[in-house]
């Protein structure tokens, strides 16, 4: 569960950390194993919302190898396409084939290690003696790969309708409504009994901050009969 937006009202709002600062902290904590250059933005979302790095795991205890060491950042973004996560696709298959060929042509220890790990992954995904189900293949891929996602949620102070309109992460309802997650966190979460012992009222104040009404004034919205806010998300009008 993510507590952001108005539900983060009890946190020190002056203690913000930017996406760049998070990436620098990761680089420092990993002692350079991961750098800013190993992260890419997610194409299906606004560029300020997500940064992701994929790592090839060494099951013998060696350091993980970021995908950007054998795939360009542009190729990795292209393989992500219109999804938040890497999924099997012809584009990803071709990219990995190209990466294997380039690694094979190199003559250094790290390239050889990356080749060895990729070979292990391929053997697990495509064993010679049997076919594997899609579920088995997914589990094998998850075992040999890790992803680090940095997600910059919005709250009332940095609420940006341009980012909201490009959102690809939404709460979905039976009537087909999709509410971008940051819009839900800011406008709805603290008014639902399942999340709040004492749900707040629209327009109520907390330490001088108006809940929801300031944000609603920023966006052009259409309301359905239940009063729930409908905001556009990427790919929908």
What are these regions (language model features)?
Residues 1-39, 43-46, 60-62, 176:
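Conserved C-terminal portion of the radical SAM core fold
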Residues 47-51:
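A short, glycine/Asx- and small/polar-enriched loop/turn
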Residues 56-237:
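Radical SAM enzyme core and accessory elements
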């Amino acid at each position: 569960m993510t507590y952001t937006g108005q539900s983060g009202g009890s946190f020190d709002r002056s203690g913000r950390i930017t996406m760049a600062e998070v990436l620098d902290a990761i680089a420092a904590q990993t002692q350079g194993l991961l750098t800013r250059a190993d992260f890419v933005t997610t194409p299906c979302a606004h560029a300020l919302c997500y940064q992701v790095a994929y790592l090839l795991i060494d099951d013998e205890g060696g350091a993980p190898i970021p995908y950007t060491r054998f795939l360009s950042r542009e190729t990795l973004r292209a393989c992500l396409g219109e999804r938040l996560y890497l999924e099997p696709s012809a584009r990803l298959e071709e990219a990995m084939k190209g990466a294997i060929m380039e690694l094979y042509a190199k003559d250094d220890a790290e390239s050889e290690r990356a080749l060895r790990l990729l070979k292990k992954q391929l053997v697990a995904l495509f064993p010679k003696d049997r076919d594997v189900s899609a579920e088995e293949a997914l589990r094998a891929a998850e075992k040999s790969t890790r992803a680090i996602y940095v997600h910059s949620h919005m709250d009332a102070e940095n609420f940006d309708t341009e980012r909201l309109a490009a959102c690809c992460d939404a709460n979905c309802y039976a009537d087909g409504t999709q509410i971008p997650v940051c819009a839900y966190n800011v406008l709805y979460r603290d008014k639902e009994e399942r999340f709040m012992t004492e749900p707040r009222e629209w327009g109520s104040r907390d330490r001088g901050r108006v809940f929801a009404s300031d944000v609603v004034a920023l966006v052009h919205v259409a309301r359905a009969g239940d009063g729930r806010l409908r905001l556009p998300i990427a790919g929908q009008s």
